[in-house]
Amino acid sequence: MITYQTGHVPDLDAVIELYRASTLGERRPIDDRERMAAMLKNANLVITAWDGSLIVGIARALSDFCYFTYLSDLAVRVSHQRKGIGKELIRRTQSAGGPKTTLLLLAAPG
């Protein structure tokens, strides 16, 4: 069963490993630990998906919680894709942003 957490920023190594396992690591500075740590620290909305103790998805966003939410990273492990996890992370991000908030997600191919 997949569970979701809002506001909990997981261990940096776990997030980097997730990015690699989701292919998002191809487009993020995963070899620059300081930058990755800052990216996580400065996001004001982080929602994660868990399969037991394994992080399987993450939505990392910036929001003013009243008008606009920018979903800068959406990653789901390849092994857990096509199970609705990404859609649920998007839904929860939109909901956390507020009822009148516009959600922006720029997606890459693949």
Predicted regions and their residues:
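A generic "binding-loop/recognition-motif" signal
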Residues: Y67, P109-G110
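Conserved GNAT acetyl-CoA-binding A-motif
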Residues: I90, S95-A108
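Conserved beta-strand in the GNAT
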Residues: T48, L54-S63, F68-A75
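Hydrophobic alpha-helical segments typical of transmembrane helices
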Residues: D32-R35, G57, Y70, L89
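Generic structural signal for conserved hydrophobic packing positions in ordered secondary structure
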Residues: V15, L71, L103-L105
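Short amphipathic alpha-helix that is part of the acyltransferase structural core
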Residues: M1-I30
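A short helix-loop-beta-strand connector motif used in the catalytic cores of GNAT acetyltransferases and
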Residues: A37-T48, P99-T102
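Conserved acetyl-CoA-binding loop-helix of GNAT-fold acetyltransferases
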Residues: V76, R82-S95
